[in-house]
Amino acid sequence: MTVLSRFTFGLALAALVATSAAPLSADQAKELRIGYQKDGVLLIVKQQGALEKRLAQAGVKLSWVEFQSGPPLLEALNSGAIDIGQTGDTPPIYAQAAGSKLVYLAAAPDLGKRSGILVRADSGITKVADLKGKRVAFTRGSSAHNVVVRLLANAGLTFADIQPVDLQPADAAAAFRNGGIDAWAIWDPFFALGQRFPNARTLTDAEKAPSNRFFLAGADYAAQNPDAVSTFVQELDRASRWATAHPADLATLFSSVTGVDPDVEKIVAARDVYTIHYLDNAIIHQQQQIADAFQQLGLIPHAVDVRAIAYVPSAKARAALAQAERQ
């Protein structure tokens, strides 16, 4: 089994931690189903187990469902198969345009170091402008889709100047290695793994296209379970602060789950930023700019209003997060 296969299908190892928190109210839903990918702060939350313990105090069962990318995760969210999940910036824009009933709960900054475009070293492609007419793979509707759109624009190209190839990460990796595509836009840890492929070269990272990752919920779930949502965001914050303080342990945790070389996971951990925020005007504005660009390019059928589906936490929830940050 390849390293990439172990990453995609590897078994998770639990690392439970204790927590002291008030129980949730008794009228919450009795199950919370979270969709996740094998990276980032949500994986930390899963492995450390504190959220599971806090929910159990109110008799709420926690279950986890793994996804390889954001678009299928949000399809599951819209269908009611999961209640909460994490994606990059682009999947919720497509989901909102398609009429999905979801809300943005919180955001984590993505400074662009954890995503980029890989090319074959013998391709003759030395700058983004050289992608004109080339086969560029990414998952349609994923954060990599936005990376391609924005980096092309920065280089004076449009989306119509390339041959887009819609592939999930594992399929794109195989196509890249066998020469079936010219370039691959992808995020960590796939990005870090791809950088180690023979004959692979990093064309650029996405530092010139910074954005956010988002934690989203079904609209009905968020409205009916404010205490569970507040607890979830508090645990995201706690896990983020732990990650910032324990980079070596973080790489070990990631490697234990993904099967990826710890040295690769150290790179992944170092390129990320671990902070959590409820959505503010700046975050909403940045996401709206992406949505507007996709509508203008005809990539979504109509304009969407990001603010209309931004979750508004109660004063109690904001105070609880502020208190958690001081602990």
Predicted ranges, named:
Residues 8-20:
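Bacterial N-terminal signal peptides
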Residues 21-26:
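Sec/Tat signal peptide C-region and signal peptidase I cleavage site
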Residues 27-157, 165-166, 182-185:
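Short, glycine-/small- and polar/acidic-enriched structural segments
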Residues 41-42, 111-117, 200-201, 211-215, ...:
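Small-molecule pocket liners
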Residues 90, 161-165, 170-257:
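Pocket-lining segment of extracytoplasmic ligand-binding domains
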Residues 223-301:
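Secondary-structure end/capping motifs
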